[in-house]
Amino acid sequence: MAVSSISTSFIEEFESGVHMAYQRMGSKLRNTIRNRSGVKNKTTFQKIGKGFATTKARHGAIAPMNLDHTNVNVTLEDYFAGEWIDDLDQLRINHDEMLVAQQSGAYALGRKTDDLIKAAMTTTSSTHNETTNGITLVWALQLMELFGNNEVPDDGKRFVAVGWEQWSQLLDLDEFSRSNYIGEDQLPFPQGVTAKQWLGFTWFPHSGLDEAGSSNVDRVCFAYHGDAVAHAIGADVTSNMQYHNDKDSYFVLNKMQMNSVLIDAEGVFKMQLKK
């Protein structure tokens, strides 16, 4: 097949498909945290300390809060996901095959995005482990208390990412899964969505969490507030296709430029939980 006979519409469909698949099925964590686009190599996220109100004497000066300002820096990294496609194989590709190629690149970049976010959250000093029984009601209530005592805002941006084993443990808790306790509108599977609001957190299963412990009997999970972690984006997912005459093949390259950073350790808990 001659290079000039490659359909431009095919290339455009491929590029659009990779980006849409990445947004829909790739990263599960990116949309839950702070994001900044258009970053040039390096950026700074600001962490502002707590302010305190004071009184003043009549006609007296108002004492300033003197808010603490802390800078958190992150440097972008480049990531690639490429695949060779033989020219003559184009005759064998149908729309299903193209979709497989699109999703493969999207999943690879999506997994890498979540890896960056998990790596940032792993640097937290806050922990809440349960390596004997896994998730229990007592453990979940203690997690709520930890966030409350840290004054982490209860504003709908608290999340808990758990492994599928921990998700099964949650479903065994009547307080999590029975309408007698939470109401029918808060059941774990409304319209097939695998996520649930409980105790002020959005709980959801994640298949990419690392194993831990002796013989990998535990899984490293995370509870976090969306503003406590940040993700910087220099270049979102893009795709291009080039023909290489010496291989009589096309190289499909998907790439992105991103990185993540922890902003506030009090808002991110790393949790080693029994499977």
Regions flagged by a language model, labelled:
Residues 1-74, 268-273:
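N-terminal "assembly arms/tails" that initiate or stabilize quaternary assembly
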Residues 86-152, 270-275:
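Alpha-helical scaffold segments that mediate packing/assembly in large oligomeric complexes
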Residues 69-91:
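Short acidic, glycine/tyrosine-flanked loop/strand segments centered on an H-E-D-like triad
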Residues 123-193:
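Extended, solvent-exposed, turn-rich assembly/linker loops in the middle of proteins
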Residues 41-42, 155-158, 218-219, 249:
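Short, surface-exposed beta-edge/turn micro-motifs
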Residues 53-55, 93, 169-172, 261-263:
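Short helix/loop capping segments that flank catalytic or ligand/cofactor-binding pockets
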Residues 240-275:
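Extended, compositionally biased alpha-helical segments that mediate assembly or anchoring
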Residues 192-245:
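Glycine/small-residue-rich hydrophobic helix-like segments
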